[in-house]
Amino acid sequence: MFLLYEYDIFWAFLIISSLIPILAFFVSGVLAPINKGPEKLSSYESGIEPMGNAWLQFRIRYYMFALVFVVFDVETVFLYPWAMSFDVLGISVFVEALIFVLILIVGLVYAWRKGALEWS
């Protein structure tokens, strides 16, 4: 039977952890001074005069390459706990991790075939 009161601590944590950033943004928006001027709108380059225009267009290739990198970086985060507890968990978890890696390899092959990993 599903008992809702067992999750009271979870819901309290979720509500409080959501309200703290919202409250912080609200308070900073109310208390912050509003000074708009040319210096406020100029780009900042480590304390020196900006060189060139700050608004540059990036090629979509860089975005796709970064997106593929993030996906496989997150894969590493998911596989690390599995690797650390491999001897305790057994063969069933090994099969699950293998399926996870195979799905990601299929995604990598798909991205490779679509040209997301090519620079030219």
UniProtKB/Swiss-Prot annotation:
Keywords: Chloroplast, Membrane, NAD, NADP, Plastid, Plastoquinone, Quinone, Thylakoid, Translocase, Transmembrane, Transmembrane helix, Transport. The keyword Ubl conjugation does not apply. The keyword Coiled coil does not apply. It comes from the Eukaryota. The chain crosses the membrane at residues 9-29, 64-84, 88-108. NDH is composed of at least 16 different subunits, 5 of which are encoded in the nucleus. This is NAD(P)H-quinone oxidoreductase subunit 3, chloroplastic. It comes from Daucus carota. The lineage of its organism: Eukaryota, Viridiplantae, Streptophyta, Embryophyta, Tracheophyta. The gene is ndhC.
